[in-house]
Amino acid sequence: MDGDKVIENGSVVVTNNKITYVGEGTLAIKLPKGATSIDLEGKTIMPGLIDVHAHLGAFRGGVSPQKHWQYYTNLAYGVTTTHDPSVNSEITFAQSEMVRSGKMIGPRIYSTGTILYGADGDFKAVINNLEDARSALRRTKAYGAFSVKSYNQPRRAQRQQVVQAAREIGIRVVPE
């Protein structure tokens, strides 16, 4: 994309589920033999939307459905990528892998996994010292998270321990 520029008559090539070419006018490259061509004249193609704060219900009673209505709804409205900043790690990363491998239909799923929550809640990791923070972040990163949500930590020292551990481990922190 180039800012707000609209290509009125263009061509798009998708190879192995990845956009490999976008151009104006008729196709300027040669398609591989046996490639599927779809005429979308009069239609609009746009990049997928990203929901950066989505709670898609991946933790409902510990049950992970094979068909998740919220995933279908997201896709129907053009949301192709989601980020859940607080959810059960085991289920969300399992579902993310199922979507990635084609065993489940849904948007790309990114998540912080289990929240580092300073108050009582369903899902939390208690941080009382730097080693607690390191342990929680190592576990979260091992699930597949690239970030962790630190929320409602009662003391400044706890927030600093989370940030220090994150820097050491190479994971980002989504603060409250």
Locations of the language-model features?
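Divalent-metal coordination cores built from histidine and acidic residues
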Residues: 40, 44-45, 49-57, 66-175
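N-terminal processing/targeting junctions
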Residues: 59-61
